[in-house]
Structures are given as C-alpha cells and as structure tokens.
From Swiss-Prot:
Region of interest (Disordered), ranges: 51-131
Protein name, UniProt field: Inactive carboxypeptidase-like protein X2
Database matches in SUPFAM superfamilies: Carboxypeptidase regulatory domain-like, Galactose-binding domain-like, Zn-dependent exopeptidases
Subcellular location: Secreted
Record-linked PROSITE patterns: CARBOXYPEPT_ZN_1 (PS00132), FA58C_1 (PS01285), FA58C_2 (PS01286), FA58C_3 (PS50022), PEPTIDASE_M14 (PS52035)
Gene coding for it: CPXM2
Basic residues bias locations: 79-90
Source organism (scientific name): Homo sapiens (Human)
Amino acid sequence: MSRPGTATPALALVLLAVTLAGVGAQGAALEDPDYYGQEIWSREPYYARPEPELETFSPPLPAGPGEEWERRPQEPRPPKRATKPKKAPKREKSAPEPPPPGKHSNKKVMRTKSSEKAANDDHSVRVAREDVRESCPPLGLETLKITDFQLHASTVKRYGLGAHRGRLNIQAGINENDFYDGAWCAGRNDLQQWIEVDARRLTRFTGVITQGRNSLWLSDWVTSYKVMVSNDSHTWVTVKNGSGDMIFEGNSEKEIPVLNELPVPMVARYIRINPQSWFDNGSICMRMEILGCPLPDPNNYYHRRNEMTTTDDLDFKHHNYKEMRQLMKVVNEMCPNITRIYNIGKSHQGLKLYAVEISDHPGEHEVGEPEFHYIAGAHGNEVLGRELLLLLVQFVCQEYLARNARIVHLVEETRIHVLPSLNPDGYEKAYEGGSELGGWSLGRWTHDGIDINNNFPDLNTLLWEAEDRQNVPRKVPNHYIAIPEWFLSENATVAAETRAVIAWMEKIPFVLGGNLQGGELVVAYPYDLVRSPWKTQEHTPTPDDHVFRWLAYSYASTHRLMTDARRRVCHTEDFQKEEGTVNGASWHTVAGSLNDFSYLHTNCFELSIYVGCDKYPHESQLPEEWENNRESLIVFMEQVHRGIKGLVRDSHGKGIPNAIISVEGINHDIRTANDGDYWRLLNPGEYVVTAKAEGFTASTKNCMVGYDMGATRCDFTLSKTNMARIREIMEKFGKQPVSLPARRLKLRGQKRRQRG
C-alpha cells in the first residue's frame, strides 16, 4: 500500500520487480549506488499497524512477522528462548542494585560467547550478516544522540508514554500522568506491538539492552521479544536462531538493564523490537539502548558535517582507581613544577581520596592568590564528571607546557585543587557494572550506604531559626556557622568521605568551587533547602543570589548544549527558562547539601554542575563530552577573580586573621585567611565595604568592581581600640587589665555596705 499521491500503480510494480530481482544477490545489494539516494516515499505511517501483505515482498522467508503474530496467541509461552551471551543473573524484584560481573566501563559490552550462525541469508531486504563477532558502542538513546524523530512505535498509551520516552535509564516525574513518563508503553497488549529506531544510515547492529518502566506506582516490563531489521521500514527480517525466529529473554523487574547480543551482527538502517511476552500484571512498556557501529558513508554529507571531533591529545577512556592514580602520576611527572598530588583522607574501604593541586607554587598558599576547587564523584555512578576532571588536569598541564597565555595566567594567579573521585568505593562498584548495565543507581552511595550529597550538617535551619528570633548577627553570625556537636560525634551517621571533605574545606580558604554531578544538564546554585518546611519545591535565594546566578550562567552559557533551546529535556525538567540554571530548592529540596554547607560554614561559594544526561556514558562519547564542557570548566575557574580582594592589616603591617568583611546590603559576611588576605565575589558595581576585627576599630571604604576580568584591590588598615591598647600595655607590664563591669559591681557592693 502506498501513500495517496506519491506513486502510481505502475511505478509500484516496477519497484516490486526490482526488489524481487535483488533476492539472492549474495550481498550485492549493499553495493548498489542507488541505495544511498533512495527516498522512503512509500513508507507506511510509523504508528500504523503492520499489514500481512508486506510478506509478499519476502517470499523466501519461512514465516513473516504477520504470520508469526497470527500463531503466537495460541501458545502459552514462546517456543524458543535464546541464551543470552551476557545475561544478568536472576535477582529478586527488590534487589536495589545489579552487579553484572566483568562489565568494565572501558570495555563496554565487548566480551561475548559463541552462538549459532543465523541461517536464511536469502531474502529481499538488504541485510548483511557477519561471521566475526564485533563489539559496538551504544547508538545514543540515553545520551540523546538519537533524536525523538528517530524513534517510532506501533501504538502508544498517551504522549507521555510515547516512543521518545523509550530511552535507557530515562526517569519519570513524581506526577506520572504528565508528558514525562518513564518508558514507551504500547496502546494495546498484543503481539503486534513494536518500537523502532531509525539509525539514518547503514549500521552494524550487535545488541539490545532493555529495561522496564520507571515508575513509583506501576510494574511494567517486557519478558521476551524478537528483533527485526530493515532498510526501508517496509520489509523486515527477523533475527533467526537456526531456522526459527530468535526469542530474546527480557527483564524480570523494571530497573535492572538486561543485555542481549545478536547471534551475528546485522547491517541495516532500521531496527525494531517486537515484544512477545510481558509481566502478567503489567503492560507492554520498555526502555532500551541499541548497540551498533555506524558504517562509513562517504556519500552522506549530513553525517560528515555533524561529526564531533577533538584536537586535544588526551586519554579518552574510563579509569578505575588504579588507573586514575597512575594518570595523576604521569601528569605530575610531565608538569612537576606546577602540580602536586596529595590525599584528603580515606574512604570507608580505605581508598585514599586523591587530589591534584595546580599552581606555580604547589604546596603553599600565596598571599593574595585565591583558592579554587573542583569535586566530582560524590555519587560513584556519576562517572562523567570524574573523567572530565582527569581530562582537565591533562589539558592544563599540556597547555601550560605549550605556553598558552590564558592557561599560564590562570595557573600563576590561582591555586587550583581537583578532587576527581570523592566516592571511590561507589565508583568501583559502578565500574564493575559498566556504562550501560549499571542502571541508574549502582554505585551511587558510599560503601556504608550514605548519600554524600546530603550528608553535611543542616546549617540552614540553625540560621533561619536564629533569624526568626532576631538573634542574627547579635548571637548567631550570618556566616561561619558552627557545626553542631552531635554531628561531630563518632556515632553520628556521617560518611568518612564527608568528614574528609569538611576537614579539607576548613583547612584551605577556598573562594569558589564546583561539584560535578550527572543525569541532567543544568547548573544548580544554593540554597538547596526550602525555607518552608511543608514544601518540597520553593525558590529559596541566598543573600548573594545575584552572584550565584552569574556564576551558574557563566558555566551554562559557555557549555555547548545547556542553553541550546533546540535540545530536548533529559528526563522531566525543562531548565531553558532559566538559561540552563536553577535554584536548588526550587528544583527539589535537599537538607545538608555541600552547596549550603560550604556557603554557611566557609567563605566558599559552591555550585552543583550537572554535566550530562547520561551519568555513565560510553567511553566513545568522552571526546564529545569533553568538547561540550572544556570551555565551561575553564571559564568557571576564571570567575574566582571576580569581585574584590585585599589585605586587612594592623598599623604595623601585620595581617589580621579572621577579620570580618561586610558588604552593605548583603546579609552575608566572609572572613580573612590566616595571613589577613580575603576575596569577596561580587558582580560589577559600587559597594560600601567594612572590615572589622575584635580589638580593632572598624574601617569602611567604597570599592568599585568593574566589568573587566580581575578582582578590584581593596585593602584595609585597622587601628586598635583604646581598650585594646590599655590591655596591651597592662599585659606588657605584667598586670591584669581592669574589668569595668566587675569594678562597677564591686563599688555598688561597697556603697550598699556603707549604707547598711
């Protein structure tokens, strides 16, 4: 059947004759130069029901899809089940994390077992079958490299469960009746349902990974399915196991990914999944990823034009703990004058938490030079941030040696700390599962089951309660809020990794920091906790909201995709209205986040940077992800030089530590470091700044912040108060200073006794 107005019956007969003449051409069809220019003008609508008449295009096939579908309802179970080369072990439905063995992330889906070579090479569809087993990367359903327009299905329940939602690891929102549900779900539960991927070029398909529906309330997954391929979306060839259709074993629960590799690779443009059975109490719903190698096509200008390449000579692979340590050592040997490797503590399993320092004087704090840090891997399965930081360290070293003026200036004027893996225990667990089979949560938590991202003390509540009682800043400061004693006790549920980070941040006077996370494309800034306790989402700004907005935008706007209005959402949230940025509390509330703790307990302004929709992309995607984030990573580091900086000294020129720097109109102060130097992040404008310290007279200045990069110098010299001078003189001569309140009380007592 052809579309009305698209072809005459005579032309259709000619095409049919050409197709039948190609049967048995022994693969010559793949060399047909007309293939590359053919238009799929006769393609049926994507959501139409497959017609049995299509089988007339494939007379050599023993049974077409339509015939098989007519027989299937009479059988209680599929007659044959394929033995998967990489089947995940069976687990209970409540199993939280899958541990598929031997799935190293830098060898994604590479190891295979032998299987029978499929028969039936004589067919009308131009499909090539390979004898040699080959491993191929994912096509990119999870990373969104495959667009929504390339996904099609027979039927859908509703738009929110359309084919475009059938992506591996896609997450549903809390409200599952909106446009953002967690799978493709067929409109009917029968054997004629399918979901299809158009690769838009010849591709060597090698495997399929499936999941059930992501849902808090429903249990839906496919337990077995067939795989079909086509070059024109009309004539389909089912993957065979000998002489019969191969039935692949699907999922046994809804979250653990299951891999099935094809017995032999199939070369085609389209691939279709046809569910054969599903969970008894559920519906036909699935998420998936396709493994395939696009074939070179010199005639296709579109693909050549859109290929992402990088010129940076970096180590684009996933590194386990040992390899990460070795890479750090190599970088240190390449750039010994600007790098230093150290550790901030140990994980629960005893793995050292290594960091790389980059500075022209590594190992020491230079007066007047700001400190910056990047952290990644708080969630062990969010691997992209870890690899981006390892790439960043290599890049900075190479560019410094090449005397790149921008990088040289950054290194000489900034002390940079890079902590690529805060949760190495979790990462090793995710690394063992691999990039595609780890699911959404394998390795997220520490070894003792703690989520580091919300394991810091909740200082927000302490501050807000004090503000409600009007005790700020008289009794409770608006900054440097002390950690509660219960949190410091050994019995507190605090991860070893969390304690290590807190000690690290208290030791080094960080000014700006970014913690890299995954699963979204957005930059989140504090506060992360809502102020209204009965709400789960509420815009909760800090006193420095305008500064945080700029810092977030500086990263998002220089990222290749974050502010692209044409890109689709990763899962459920559309952050384009805020230009790729979001206030953490207005997104979802988190108590005890690193961002809030850093802002309220230290001088550091911390933001969460979500660098990709795919938490654990295949290593073949790392060059593209590096290109997406490279400029952003550098620009964000440069923001540490925005605002004002200076020294607070006494009349003898000695730096005053812990002096308070206040900015009029901003209810959040910072303090000077041990040498009396300070850095205050501010947007361009004129500010009234006050420096004060115990025992000194406060000093106020007008400080101007310009638009050019580089902090404005604003120094203060404080003189001691009269009482401080008296105390100093009396201590010098060995006498105790007079306590005026005590003396007044003594005089009053004497007067009472005299009257009595």
